Amino acid sequence: PTRRSSDLTRDLCEIHIGMPTQVFEETRGERGDVPKPERAGKLADVFNRYAGVSYASPGAVQLEKSLIRWMGDLVGYPAGAAGDLTSGGSIANLMGVVAARDAAELKGNQLESSPIYLTEQVHHCVDKAIRIAGLGECPRRIIPMDAGYRMDAEVLAATIQKDKSVGYKPWLIVASAGTTDTGSVDPLETIADIAAFHGIWFHVDAAYGGFFMLSDSARDVLNGIQHSDSVVIDPHKGLFLPYGSGAILVKDGASLHKAHYYDAHYMQDAKTN
């Protein structure tokens, strides 16, 4: 006999509640489990708005812009910053790497002499983003860490100087603000100074630690994040929201636009509305 959908929903909920996850035992999920996002998600499904352009859904686009502006203010970015809500840190890091790549105007024959600087503690999605962005031929300089699993800024500076002395053109530093393994935060202020001195794009993966900017006791640890060129931050981590909700923030909004904007004839009204 046909079962009612309410019966099926109840059965699925009972099965789910009774099955701990393989990653975090004795919990119903890895992240948030709160009712308000569930209700908001249902409303979004009911209205079913396309929020890719303002004229299609001005309210939804303005809501996203307001969220991006709030997060930009949180990390200390200026009014000209831009961003995008994503499905999580993987896509957000990819968008940041692509924005950095296009800002550096890298060409195929330049990749082998254009190093990227990071540590072994960087999230694996950054390596994936580098490959997907067509940057697999760029030398990856794995910078040693101190006893607290933080990037050694002195070694970073020396490595960059060495690369430049042989004609290489450093273009990207990836720092972590809350690593997955240890929660460590790289010395962002010092790294920002090094990046600015050499004219290198400074990207911070703050998917785990970024929202600790809301904490008076932890904010100082993240000092320097405001000097980065791009930041990844995940609401489904620091704000305990359900999957998937990530964000990419770019200080120079024009760089994000340049890297990800495309046009089409059928979208002509988007320019005038």
Question: Which residue stretches match the model-derived regions?
Answer:
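Catalytic PLP-binding core of fold-type I/II PLP enzymes
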Residues: 155, 184-216
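Active-site C-terminal subdomain of aminotransferase-like
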Residues: 179, 223-273
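A glycine-/small-polar-enriched, mobile loop at the entrance of the PLP active site in fold-type I
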Residues: 15-34, 44-63
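Conserved N-terminal alpha-helix of the aminotransferase class I/II PLP-enzyme fold
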Residues: 45-88, 99
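PLP-dependent aminotransferase-class I/II
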Residues: 87, 110-114, 118-175, 182-190
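Short acidic, glycine/serine/threonine-rich loops at helix termini
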Residues: 95-98, 127-131, 183-187, 212-217, ...
